[in-house]
């Protein structure tokens, strides 16, 4: 495909677009599946108040509603896009296994490191301000961080692809 495009940057941007569309496609299938199951079972219930109250030991759920759906549905998509594009860039700059190691490290860091800079935290609904009183996570920061990571990864990949011998 690189030979047909004749331009390394066009090939790189094509890979980026394909990567982004793939991630969006996976989420679309997920959301459509959840919707179909919800229709069959009699309604969409993202969080049953009684169950959530029990799990959170009767803590008050802050900002339920729109913010819950934002943290549950929109923020993970942005973070997943950032992780996927960065993995692809690392695979081009270094080697493909390094990209997989980076993804595992990001997700594992989200388990052990509670920080607004740790992308893995934004993939866990329990760490968000909706379900965790006093949470340091912020949806806007997640979008900014994810978008910045995508932009930096695209630029670094574009620069690298021009200089690197990718045929060998």
Where are the predicted features?
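Terminal transmembrane helical anchor/hairpin motif
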Residues: 51-67, 98-168
């Amino acid at each position: 495909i690189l030979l047909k495009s004749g331009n390394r940057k066009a090939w790189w941007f094509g890979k980026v677009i394909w990567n982004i569309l793939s991630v969006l496609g996976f989420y679309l299938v997920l959301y459509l599946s959840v919707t179909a199951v919800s229709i069959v079972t009699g309604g969409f219930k993202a969080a049953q108040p009684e169950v959530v109250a029990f799990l959170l030991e009767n803590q008050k759920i802050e900002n339920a509603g729109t913010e819950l759906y934002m943290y549950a549905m929109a923020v993970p998509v942005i973070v997943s896009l950032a992780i996927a594009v960065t993995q692809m860039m690392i695979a081009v700059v270094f080697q493909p296994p390094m990209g997989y190691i980076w993804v595992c490290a990001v997700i594992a860091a989200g388990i052990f490191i509670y920080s607004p800079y740790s992308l893995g935290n934004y993939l866990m609904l329990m760490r968000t301000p909706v379900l965790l009183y006093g949470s340091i996570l912020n949806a806007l920061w997640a979008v900014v961080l994810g978008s910045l990571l995508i932009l930096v990864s695209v630029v670094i990949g574009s620069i690298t692809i021009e200089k690197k011998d990718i045929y060998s």
